[in-house]
A protein has these predicted regions:
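C-terminal domain-closing interface element
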Residues: 355-374
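C-terminal auxiliary extensions adjacent to catalytic cores
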Residues: 371-394
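Active-site substrate-recognition segment that forms the wall
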Residues: 201-236, 245, 249-253, 274
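A short coil-to-beta-strand element that immediately follows conserved catalytic motifs
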Residues: 178-182, 199-202, 223, 244-246, ...
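Acidic/histidine metal-binding catalytic segments
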Residues: 66-69, 125, 253-271, 326-331
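Conserved N-terminal helical subregion
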Residues: 2-6, 23, 48-190, 233-251, ...
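Conserved mid-domain beta->alpha element of the FAD-binding
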Residues: 6-36, 158-159, 185, 215, ...
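Short, flexible helix/strand-to-coil boundary loops that buttress conserved ligand/catalytic motifs
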Residues: 42, 58-59, 68, 88-89, ...
Length: 394
């Protein structure tokens, strides 16, 4: 199909996964990363069975399984009482139901597995300090504009350039991302600093009124990932700002001492203000397509942002490899992904409101509802999500 390389704007998880997927079906690509180095900002990431399906398709399943920490359960705790509300076991029955485990991994380790696979491919070229600013289409070619660099011609352009995508800005021309009013503070601490009574082999969520705390082990139990979020109605987006423990503490003075001690032990806290966008029905423009956060940014509450980007990469590369022309491939890709990702975007917001942050009677309703669900029922409720990540054959 292609006589020129695909150009991929963005060298994050979605961009590298797309390059690997395209190489799997015999297509070359050039990955353009705006930063001076390829890497990931952040710490832990949860990888559900659908993510492992993506890893297997991309040819990095074995490597990712070596990096992952396999937790025993997803645990929901009451941040006001200190008691467990419910948990979802991630045991043999879970793995038999979905064909893959649920695990956690350091984001940098996931990115590095993809990066090393890209470097080992003869079909992928990686370029740093290449910020894409726009594109122009003519005939069977797309010309990509790069800040302070010569234009680059390719067969197609994939905008995997994140929440503030320049490719999306030209294609969609919509408003800036929507500021959620939720502020997240992140820290990674050595395991010996984690309170002994909270060193659980679980992804643990302490849910409280307008706030929550998440923690789980990483890097072979050498460290714990701490993520605490406060719905403080902040209006301005912010990314990775260093913050004091005292400022983090302000949003959690009302919760039980047991989860609050997580904040006491956190170090080097950094602040993010969560943003998303309203879902859209189209992210294809001729020979240009969006992917991941550039197409469908979502809040963190379903722990599916990176998973959805990798599913996008699987779908796009599969359709490019099986369709007769690019128009058909991109149309099928959009059909594969639009409704599914819209559901995840909307559900992520709803989960934040009704599972993570309710208070009073709404919290009591949440507890009663979730305690009544059996593990088998949980598996069925999650099947639509965790069964993804494989190429659709229609």
């Amino acid at each position: 199909m292609a006589d020129k390389p695909f150009i991929i704007s963005g060298g994050g998880i979605g961009g590298l996964a797309t390059a690997l997927g395209l190489s799997r079906v015999g297509h070359s690509s050039i990955v353009l990363e705006q930063s001076s180095r390829l890497g990931e900002i952040g710490a832990g990431i949860q990888i559900a069975p659908n993510a492992f399906n993506c890893f297997d398709y991309l040819g990095v399943g074995n490597e990712m399984r070596k990096e992952a920490v396999y937790i025993d359960r997803l645990r929901l705790m009451d941040a006001l009482t200190g008691d467990e509300i419910c948990h979802i076991p991630l045991d043999t029955a879970f793995q038999e139901r979905f064909g893959n485990p649920y695990a956690v991994v350091h984001r940098a380790d996931l990115h590095n597995v993809l990066l090393e696979a890209c470097k080992a491919s003869g079909l992928i070229e990686l370029r740093t300090s290449h910020p894409v600013t726009g594109y122009h289409q003519e005939g069977g070619t797309v010309t990509v504009r790069i800040l302070d660099k010569q234009d680059l011609k390719g067969y197609a352009l994939i905008g995997a350039d994140g929440l503030h995508s320049a490719v999306r800005m030209q294609m969609i021309g919509d408003d800036p991302p929507r500021v959620s009013g939720h502020t997240t503070y992140r820290s990674v601490i050595p395991t010996e600093m984690m309170p002994k009574d909270l060193r659980w082999n679980a992804a643990t969520l302490w849910a409280g009124p307008k706030c929550h705390i998440v923690h789980y082990p990483l890097k072979g139990w050498k460290v714990f990932n701490l993520v605490v979020t406060f719905h403080n109605d902040v209006k301005e987006a912010m990314t990775g700002k260093p913050i004091s423990r005292e400022e983090v503490y302000r949003g959690f003075e009302h919760i039980h001492p047991r989860p609050r001690q997580v904040i006491d032990h956190g170090i080097d806290w950094k602040l993010w203000v969560l943003c998303d966008r309203e879902p859209i029905t189209n992210w294809v423009d001729g020979r240009v397509a969006l992917l991941g956060d550039a197409a469908h940014p979502m809040l963190q509450y379903f722990a599916q942002g990176a998973c959805m980007a990798m599913e996008d990469a699987v779908s796009l590369s599969h359709r490019v490899g099986t369709c007769n022309n690019l128009d058909s491939a991109f149309a099928q890709y959009l059909e594969d992904r639009m409704v599914r990702t819209t559901r995840v975007v909307i559900d992520s917001s709803l989960i934040g409101d009704h599972i993570y942050h309710p208070s009073g009677a709404q919290a009591a309703l949440r507890n009663s509802f979730m305690q009544a669900i059996t593990p088998a029922e949980w598996f069925e409720r999650l099947a639509w999500l965790y069964g993804g990540g494989k190429p659709l054959e229609n």
